[in-house]
């Protein structure tokens, strides 16, 4: 710890990312990346942009990308905010809408960046305990003092919360912002975007990292009423006006436009997810129902951490969280069918030896 650090720097406990190995032979099922490449139209846009456009600053407002996303969701451009990945959008949203003296509510088992943001911005927060089956009790989000954030589908569980439940939470917090983090919504859930017209306190946050295969480009966005987006822009432009580079913006536009390719890839992930769930069930694993591109699994006989280590020895990475209530679970990203077949072969051999 350095004497030059501020008190905030000394006190903060940073988020820990999933491992990014250099070895290309490793099967990476630990960070919920898409196993399929971006649309060919995305790759062509990147090639074209790299020829001359890099000498110019990007559009600070990302107007063309905002229009593209707005058209896709039947919104206006003024109802779209673009950020450098959904993590930046989330961080700016915490700063824009939550006050230090008012308690924010989010689930005790959810995206572990939320408490990092809350601590960084000196926000009070309350952890709403999930039920035994990891479902949300919406009563825990009733009349919050400072607002709420819901991950839907939840991470790391993959459980989806119905739109009726989202509506109830919005109505119970009509004077506070409710954020719905929809990083994984495209793998089987129904988005809350349709509710924006009726709920001025709703902010929906999405990413192109998962379903559009652009994790390496860092494109996230928020959708909500104009006054919410104006607030986000005030904060963003107090940090950095140019958060999105030219190439990323052009790639994102083509990724949104190529609906056919998007549907093809997400359908393959969903089919492979269902196949993997079925195969794991045959060997005694319990799987939380998932609407994401990952599954959350446990076994009554074998310890999750032991399986984690053995899988790593076999060049297969999955995610383990050494936390209360979930320390005997593994989160497994859904890879290609071929990758998941290898995963199944490895895990069968491992549990036979444990």
UniProtKB/Swiss-Prot annotation:
Q: In which pathway does it act?
A: Amino-acid biosynthesis; L-histidine biosynthesis; L-histidine from 5-phospho-alpha-D-ribose 1-diphosphate: step 7/9
Instruction: State the needed cofactors, names only.
Output: pyridoxal 5'-phosphate
The record ties this protein, via InterPro entries, to:
Aminotrans_II_pyridoxalP_BS (IPR001917), Aminotransferase_I/II_large (IPR004839), HisP_aminotrans (IPR005861), HistidinolP_aminotransfase (IPR050106), PyrdxlP-dep_Trfase (IPR015424), PyrdxlP-dep_Trfase_major (IPR015421), PyrdxlP-dep_Trfase_small (IPR015422)
Q: Enumerate the Gene Ontology biological process terms.
A: L-histidine biosynthetic process
| Keyword Amino-acid biosynthesis (UniProt) | yes
Residue numbers carrying N6-(pyridoxal phosphate)lysine: 210
A Pfam family in this protein? Aminotran_1_2
Q: Does the keyword Amino-acid biosynthesis apply?
A: yes
In terms of superkingdom, the source organism counts as Bacteria
- Catalytic activity, as annotated: L-histidinol phosphate + 2-oxoglutarate = 3-(imidazol-4-yl)-2-oxopropyl phosphate + L-glutamate
Task: Please state the Enzyme Commission number of this protein.
Answer: 2.6.1.9
Q: Which UniProt keywords apply?
A: Amino-acid biosynthesis, Aminotransferase, Histidine biosynthesis, Pyridoxal phosphate, Transferase
Write one Gene Ontology MF term: pyridoxal phosphate binding
Instruction: Quote the subunit structure annotation.
Output: Homodimer.
| Family recorded in the similarity comment | Belongs to the class-II pyridoxal-phosphate-dependent aminotransferase family. Histidinol-phosphate aminotransferase subfamily.
What name appears for this protein in its UniProt entry?
Histidinol-phosphate aminotransferase
Give the organism, scientific name.
Answer: Clostridium botulinum (strain Hall / ATCC 3502 / NCTC 13319 / Type A)
